[in-house]
Amino acid sequence: MTFLLPRADGRDGVPRTVINLANHLVDGFDVEIIGLLRGNTEPAFEIDQRITVRHVMDVRPFGPDGERRNLSEGGVDEHGNAVTRKLLFERQQPSAVAPLDPRHWASSDQPLIETLRSVRSDVVVGTTPALNLFVGSYAPSGVAKVGQDHMNFVWRTRDQDERAMMCQGIQGLDVFVPLTMGDQRDYQELLPDATTWITAIPNALSWPIADRAAPVVDKVVVAAGRLEEQKAFDRLITAYAPLVASRPGWRLDIYGSGSEMPKLRRLIKQLGVGRRVTLRGHSNQMPAVLRGCAIFAMSSEREGFPMVLLEAMSVGLPMVAYDCPRGPAEVLRDGVNGRLIPDGDDAAFTAALTELMDSVELRRQMGAAALADAAAYSMPHIVTRWEAVFARLGVHPEPAVR
């Protein structure tokens, strides 16, 4: 089977979750990963050596020999002047097939089409709306065409053009796999006459589930994710600010990196909470970090499927999250494994944090429930669900391997 990614070497959640799945499917299937654009020499996430990896276009600014590449490959303009990769991307003409996705260019259309036509797998899996369009239109006949999406229905259908692209892409597939049951229902209602089978499968946990729940005694509220606009860490900091004075023994640690870091630093300084609110940067030891905390907080304005909540559940942390579209409500059971707060209600978010801060018994009770709920997102469970999809398409694991 072949997975098609915008970037096989990307650092965001899409390559992370797709590579995680591919690394486990390779035990029973021949697996290939194709990245549209190659921007780094090494992948950000470990890829099993049994998986074949190839890239459609190499946009690294430097080649293996350290020499700058030409414009078609990235790094210099037509006059030989060095340009940033951002500027180089901005100079590209939009794709004729998927003009709404800035990662697709007119110059990348034909190479991607030719790459798809060369695929010899039984199944091709697109992982974005744009890639689903290409899979549905250009994957070889006789190949099962599967599409994923890692963002929610509400966001994808927010305007007419986005909605049209989603509908066209889905209808060219044999199977479309959104991340949540809510998305499944919405797409089925949007496309009642589509022959495409629409069935939801969530992402799997990135690491094993802990044997026992975290002790939740250290007075640390933790958050993690890319420091980008959609994650809305500014509203988490704002909601936490009153607790700096009322619960002085506690602190808020935020892990991650991104373009919003300067803005968040300014907000922390403006609110005067720098002694108790810290931007910790990226960590490669998140399971250990989470086990040393007491509460997990998520403030996103929108999600496809909130992997950070699964990771908190996997170590038995109680959670507090806004009920943003669309994933938190499918993971977080209000009053059972955490608190689900009406989207945008900062006062209620602050109150929920306070409630958990003041009761270690409640933290342990909700943390134990979170740990039990994590089993539904274990990798073996999610792989079994994917295998059922492939079996319906006539593709089965090889007995000799399994």
Predicted regions and their residues:
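Aromatic "clamp/platform" in nucleotide-sugar-dependent glycosyltransferases that forms part
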Residues: 282, 301
